Amino acid sequence: MNFLTVGHRGVMGVEPENTLRSFRRAEQAGHDQVELDLHLSKDGALIVMHDAEVDRTTDGAGLIRDLTLDEIRGLDAGFGERVPVFEEVLDAVGVPIQAEIKDVAAARVLAGVLLERGATGRVSVLSFHDKALAEIHALLPEVATVLVAEELGPHIVPRAQVVGARLVSLDIRRLNLDTVRRCHDAGIKVMAWTVNTAQDWAVARALGLDGAATDLPAEPAA
């Protein structure tokens, strides 16, 4: 594949993160994909938000798992934006989506939505949590899985292989050529997060990465 640019939570560097406004801006900016995060509400809706609680990014407070969809709908996520559910993002943008999940329960609900919406070929599922990825891979083996990790080492390749991931997403600050080569030799592509500065982009290309997640609409001038 060509070098893939992914709008991290949309373009969270300039728009309220994980909102429809942010995802649309990322698509308009020309990013190949958008990345988002999912948590389950008290009543089982797939809420698009990074944190487990609503405090940081809205005018509300509390854990997502303790709030109903209606309660979350009433919150302001910035510039008057509402917190979306996953299905709304599917409808709002045409580019492929990287959906990050945190647990097995979210994996099961997401699998159902992907089947219902016929989106198994359009959405790839990311996670730091191997069990969540393994669940998606077991339920929907046709869906692309992406292992996200902070720590590097020889364990990255076998971890990815166990959960069926053909792409890993790693911290640009810790990535090195040895890890990239090890992954590529195993047929696993490598992207980095979060690539924002001109130096970050230079490192990403020098390492021969396959893609990068960024908070910004465009690569900054060197």
How would you label these PLM feature ranges?
Residues 1-222:
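Phosphate-group recognition and catalysis centered on beta-loop-alpha active-site segments
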